[in-house]
Regions:
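Intrinsic disorder at enzyme termini
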Residues: 1-12
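A non-catalytic, amphipathic alpha-helix used as a structural packing/dimerization or gating element
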Residues: 12-26
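Glycine-rich flavin
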Residues: 28-115
Length: 115
């Protein structure tokens, strides 16, 4: 490993990673095997991510989201995947599905679907 890192996460991004990891280790990982073995929706993960506001971190603050940048959103997805790959689709699909509304939706649609 080099003494001169070409890239390092900012303190803010490190804090996000640690916070997501903590939630996932405690509330997502314990159910991962059961989710996979029974091919079921990761309800426990969805509830934990929503309670911690990690289910859709990219949603702008004016609609009740965290307004996370792309790197923070990827860090959330990565940490959730570390605990349960199936559950990582929750923030990933929220990002993918909400992007058209964020980019082209009317204010009414944004308030309804993002808020």
């Amino acid at each position: 490993m080099s003494d001169f890192p070409l890239y390092a996460l900012s303190e803010e991004h490190q804090a996000i990673r640690e916070a997501v990891r903590s939630v996932c280790d405690a509330k997502v990982a314990p159910y991962a095997a059961d989710v996979d073995e029974n091919a079921r929706y990761p309800r426990e993960a969805a509830e934990a991510l929503q309670a911690a506001d990690f289910h859709a971190p990219h949603v702008p603050e004016e609609y009740g989201g965290a307004g996370a940048d792309a790197l923070a959103t990827v860090l959330v997805i990565e940490e959730v995947a570390r605990a349960c790959v199936s559950a990582s689709l929750i923030p990933a699909v929220n990002k993918l599905g909400s992007l058209p509304v964020m980019l082209s939706g009317s204010e009414e649609l944004k308030k309804h679907y993002l808020g």
